[in-house]
Structure formats: structure tokens, C-alpha cells
């Protein structure tokens, strides 16, 4: 009886254990299944491992039926947990770009890495998870986009601290080596001025007239109008008095030089003249000459008509010279001589001595003619001389008028040293008539050029504004003949020379200084050379 009751109690206990285990298993199974179902409704990702505890939202979002991309394996596929809990579900991780291949080992030190941009905090609660890109490759470029890595450069120098205005350096390439400071080159010596081009339009130049163009023709004449002694020529080449009426070069020298023909014009009557000098032109002028024959006779100078005779003799000499077979100038005889004369430039100056010496210096002409009729006679004589030059073959002829003669030192009024306006009026009257006659000749004679060259205006401007031309003294001559008066020419023994010849406009009582001649003829060449060289 006892044994059967014991057996029954054991059986019941086994039954209860079995039932208890079955119930426990059912409860555990139901509990686990319901929990997974509920979690999948509220959390679309696998239950385990849970990234971080999330509170259940009041309105669970509807899962997106589109297929979810599978994150590539690797450490970069897992989403990185933010520093703290957020009320929004974290978006799916974006596929990260593949890391670049490891660079080959190089003996050069690698540049320091650039600091990475800070992570941007997640946006506030999107209603739906962001859709991934349909094509995971290529990954979106981060901002700012780094420039492409340049080719490796061997052994760069380490990066220097940033300068105030740094240049952009590639992130993976070596910084460029700084250029060495250039060594300052020694200052070069000023190059010598290039030689002047040879003149090809004017083969020769011929000068006629008075002392403005005389380069020594009066030296062998029996005349008092000479300048072949000191102090004349004190600033000339080799400081030699050559018979030029100035302290150096005169107008004929500068005109020939600026035309590109020759540096110095020889006198035709110079006994030392060379045949080669004849081919480029000479001077026939004589100090004291004038258009009026009476003027040259009074000064015992070479009259203007005699200068034409010398010009004819010159043409014959040149013709004989070019016919010589052994001459270095292989010209074609007379035809080439005619071309030399026609292409050359003939320049005439006169009228000053006709007014100063013949009209205002003596009373004979003033008794016969008034100033108007006398200037007409002188202008007609100038036109006759030009016509005879044309007859000898000259086709390019320039005629220089008279300067303001009343303002030269020897003709100023003695007491106040002011200009003689009566003499200036006579100069202007003669110049106006000369200009009119030359204009008529240009229209009448074919294939010719007649140019009136105005020096009255140039010298008047130099007298009015001497500082603009670099002159200080315009009333007194540099070469004086006495304490209170200025003679026409410098004397050999009694003349006193000014300390600075370049600051004086006039050298003696009539003629300009070398610097004044240079200034005057520069203006003449600038204004009239393009007409004469046509």
C-alpha cells in the first residue's frame, strides 16, 4: 500500500515536471516570436546586434518596399555611432570610397597629412530614410574636392611655414623648390650711338651767299672782312681759325651735317681741297657779299655773279673727275654730273649786307630809293640769281631770308641797347617780297623746288625767350672790341672773350655763336628738309 502510493507520487511529480517544462518552452517560444515580429515592424534592420537602444516612436514609419543595398564588407561598412542618443533613426551608411593603394616606399619623407574635415551632424528627423544612389560607384566626391595627386617628384624639400601670400601646393606632391635669388648683373656700359645712315636722296650740297656760309673763301682775298685769326675758330676742330665767322662751325656746316651729306663743308677756293670733297659739295659764299653788286665791291668780296662763275667751273671739274678711269667713283661722265647737280641741294643766303652796308650804312642809296623800292630791287636780284642756278641744272634750291638785323649787337641803338626797328622793318619787307617771288618761280619752272627758309621768326623767338633755348646774353657779343661799343668783327689783339661762349647768342657784332648756329639750323632742317628732298 505504501509502495503504490510512493509510486503514484513519483509519477505525478514527473508528470508535473513535464507539463511545467512544456509550458515553459511554449511561453519562451511565444515570447521570443512575438518580440521578433514586433521589432521587425518597428525596426527594419536585424534585431541583433542592436546599435544603440532606441525608444519606440509614437508613429512608426512605413518601411520602404524598395530593396536595400547591402553594405560592402569591411570595417568601413558599419555605421559609426554618434556621440550621443538622437530621437531619430540613423540613416543607412553610405558606401565609402576605396582607400587609395599604398604608395611605393620612397626615400623621401612624406608630407604631413592634411586635417580631415569635421563630421557633419545628422539632420533632424527625416520622415523616411534617405534613398541610396542607384549606382554605388563612383562614390560622391567629398567637399571640398582635393586636386588630383601629381606625379611623384624625387626628394622634395620639407614644407616651409606659410608665407604671407602662399602659392597653392598639391596635397600629395612635393612643394616646388624655391628659385634661387638672381645675382644682380653688373650695370652695362652705355652702348655707343649707332652710326648715322648714309644719305641716299641728297648726293651733294652747294652754298652761295655771304659770311653765314663762308668757310674760308675770303682767306686769300685782299679784303678786310676775314676771320682766319684767333679768337675765331677757338671752339672749332683742332682749335684752328679756318676763315669761318664764328667761334666754331657755321650754318653751312650744320646744314650739310643734318642733311647727312658731310660733316664739314670745304671752301671752293681752299688750296688744300681734295677731289673727293668736290663730289659731295662745297661753299662758294664770301663774307661781305650781297645781291647788289655795289655791296660786294664795297667789301671787296666775291660778288654773287662771280660765285655762279665759280659754280660753272666746279661743274667742269667734277665732269673731268668722274671721267677718270682710276677714280674710285665710277660714274658715267657728263650724265652722272648732271644728276649730281639736279639731285643736290643749292642753298643761298643774302640781303643782310645789302641793307646794313649799302642802304643804311651810306647815304647814296637812301637818296636814290626809299626802303620799299630798294627792297624790291634786292628781291629781284635774288630771283635772277636763282634763275641762273636753275639754268646750270640745279632743281632743289633753298633761299634763306634776312634775320632781325636791327637786333644784332652792332646795329642796336647805342644808348639803350634796344633794337633798331627801322632796320627790322626793312628785313621783314625784303623777306615778304622774296617769299612771293619764290612762290611764283615754283609754279612757273617745271620739275623744280624753290623753298623760302625763314630765320627771322626763329631768331626773334630766341631774342624774346632766350632761357627757353639755353641762352643768357642776347644783346652783347661774346667777342668785344671796346668798353661801350661792339664792332662788326673781333680784333686780333684788343678783343676780350666771354667766359662761356655757349650762353651767348652772338659771337661778334653780327654773327651768331657756334651753339646759336646749331640751334637755328636744327629748326631749319626740321621744317624744310622734307620739302627740299622731294
Curated annotation (Swiss-Prot):
Residues 1-35 form the signal peptide. The keyword Disulfide bond does not apply. Disulfide bonds: none annotated. Keywords: Signal. GO terms for biological process: lipid metabolic process. GO terms for molecular function: lipase activity. The active site is at residues 211, 508, 511. InterPro entries: GDSL, GDSL_lipolytic_enzyme, Lipase_GDSL_AS, Pistil_extensin, SGNH_hydro_sf, SGNH_plant_lipase-like. Residues 59-202 are annotated as: Disordered. Found in sporophytic and gametophytic cell types in the anther, only in male fertile plants. Belongs to the 'GDSL' lipolytic enzyme family. This is Anther-specific proline-rich protein APG. It comes from Arabidopsis thaliana (Mouse-ear cress).
Amino acid at each position: 500500500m505504501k509502495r503504490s502510493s510512493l509510486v503514484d507520487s513519483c509519477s505525478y511529480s514527473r508528470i508535473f515536471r513535464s507539463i511545467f517544462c512544456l509550458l515553459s518552452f511554449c511561453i519562451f517560444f511565444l515570447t521570443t516570436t512575438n518580440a521578433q515580429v514586433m521589432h521587425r515592424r518597428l525596426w527594419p534592420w536585424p534585431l541583433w546586434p542592436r546599435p544603440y537602444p532606441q525608444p519606440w516612436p509614437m508613429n512608426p514609419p512605413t518601411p520602404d518596399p524598395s530593396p536595400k543595398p547591402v553594405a560592402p564588407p569591411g570595417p568601413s561598412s558599419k555605421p559609426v555611432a554618434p556621440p550621443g542618443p538622437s530621437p531619430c533613426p540613423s540613416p543607412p551608411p553610405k558606401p565609402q570610397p576605396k582607400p587609395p593603394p599604398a604608395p611605393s616606399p620612397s626615400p623621401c619623407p612624406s608630407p604631413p597629412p592634411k586635417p580631415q574635415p569635421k563630421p557633419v551632424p545628422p539632420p533632424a528627423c527625416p520622415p523616411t530614410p534617405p534613398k541610396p544612389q542607384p549606382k554605388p560607384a563612383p562614390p560622391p566626391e567629398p567637399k571640398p574636392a582635393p586636386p588630383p595627386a601629381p606625379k611623384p617628384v624625387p626628394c622634395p624639400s620639407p614644407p616651409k611655414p606659410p608665407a604671407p601670400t602662399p602659392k597653392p601646393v598639391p596635397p600629395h606632391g612635393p612643394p616646388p623648390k624655391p628659385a634661387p635669388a638672381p645675382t644682380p648683373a653688373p650695370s652695362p656700359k652705355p652702348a655707343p650711338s649707332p652710326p648715322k645712315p648714309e644719305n641716299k636722296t641728297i648726293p651733294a650740297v652747294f652754298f652761295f651767299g655771304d659770311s653765314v656760309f663762308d668757310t674760308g673763301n675770303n682767306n686769300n682775298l685782299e679784303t678786310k672782312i676775314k676771320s682766319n685769326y684767333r679768337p675765331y675758330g677757338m671752339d672749332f676742330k683742332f682749335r684752328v681759325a679756318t676763315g669761318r665767322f664764328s667761334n666754331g662751325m657755321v650754318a653751312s656746316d650744320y646744314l650739310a651735317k643734318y642733311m647727312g651729306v658731310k660733316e664739314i663743308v670745304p671752301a671752293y677756293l681752299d688750296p688744300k681741297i681734295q677731289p673727293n670733297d668736290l663730289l659731295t659739295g662745297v661753299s662758294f659764299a664770301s663774307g661781305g657779299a650781297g645781291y647788289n653788286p655795289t655791296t660786294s665791291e664795297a667789301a671787296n668780296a666775291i660778288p654773287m655773279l662771280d660765285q655762279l662763275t665759280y659754280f660753272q667751273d666746279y661743274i667742269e671739274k667734277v665732269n673731268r673727275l668722274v671721267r677718270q678711269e682710276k677714280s674710285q667713283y665710277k660714274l658715267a661722265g657728263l650724265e652722272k654730273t648732271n644728276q649730281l647737280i639736279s639731285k643736290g641741294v643749292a642753298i643761298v643766303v643774302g640781303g643782310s649786307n645789302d641793307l646794313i652796308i649799302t642802304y643804311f650804312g651810306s647815304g647814296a642809296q637812301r637818296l636814290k630809293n626809299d626802303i620799299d623800292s630798294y627792297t624790291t630791287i634786292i628781291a629781284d636780284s635774288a630771283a635772277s640769281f636763282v634763275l641762273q642756278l636753275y639754268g646750270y641744272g640745279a632743281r632743289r634750291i633753298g633761299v634763306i631770308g634776312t634775320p632781325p638785323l636791327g637786333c644784332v649787337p652792332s646795329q642796336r641803338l647805342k644808348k639803350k641797347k634796344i633794337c633798331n626797328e627801322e632796320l627790322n622793318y626793312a628785313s621783314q619787307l625784303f623777306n615778304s617780297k622774296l617769299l612771293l617771288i619764290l612762290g611764283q618761280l615754283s609754279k612757273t619752272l617745271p620739275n623744280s623746288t624753290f623753298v623760302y627758309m625763314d630765320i627771322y621768326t626763329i631768331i626773334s623767338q630766341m631774342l624774346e625767350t632766350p632761357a627757353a633755348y639755353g641762352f643768357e646774353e642776347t644783346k652783347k657779343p661774346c667777342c668785344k672790341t671796346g668798353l661801350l661799343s661792339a664792332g662788326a668783327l673781333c680784333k686780333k689783339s684788343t678783343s676780350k672773350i666771354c667766359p662761356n661762349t655757349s650762353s651767348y647768342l652772338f659771337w661778334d657784332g653780327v654773327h651768331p655763336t657756334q651753339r646759336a648756329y646749331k640751334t637755328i639750323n636744327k629748326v631749319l632742317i626740321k621744317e624744310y628738309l622734307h620739302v627740299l628732298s622731294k
